[in-house]
Amino acid sequence: MENVPKENKVVEKAPVQNEAPALGGGEYQEPGGNVKGVWAPPAPGFGEDVPNRLVDNIDMIDGDGDDMERFMEEMRELRRKIRELQLRYSLRILIGDPPHHDHHDEFCLMP
């Protein structure tokens, strides 16, 4: 037998119509990775409000303690009045006295 080099016959395949195209990328890259160089600016006016909001919150924490104390005192007073009215109404029911209106608390438009 003779040593005759054999030719390798390479058969090329015809492209398949339903096959998706390659997404690219090298040997060590995942296809569809991060796109570099694309930058979107923040919304207009977005950065202007942030420092002001922080300053307002700090002022509210530091300087508005008196307002908060006043508000809490008003809430305590309202709760006390509501409790008193509920107790008065409950006592009238227990005693059997029919409820009547305190006309001095009402506002009337008639002269």
Curated annotation (Swiss-Prot):
Annotated Zn(2+) binding lies at C108
For this chain, the family text in UniProt reads:
Belongs to the BEX family.
Natural source organism = Homo sapiens (Human)
Q: What is the lineage of its organism?
A: Eukaryota, Metazoa, Chordata, Craniata, Vertebrata
What are the annotated GO cellular component locations? cytoplasm
Identification of the protein by name: Protein BEX5
Q: Which GO terms describe its molecular function?
A: metal ion binding; signaling receptor binding
State the residue spans of region: His cluster.
100-104
Q: Which GO terms describe its biological process?
A: signal transduction
Regarding how it is modified after translation, the entry says: Ubiquitinated. Degraded by the proteasome.
Keyword Membrane included in the entry's annotation:
no
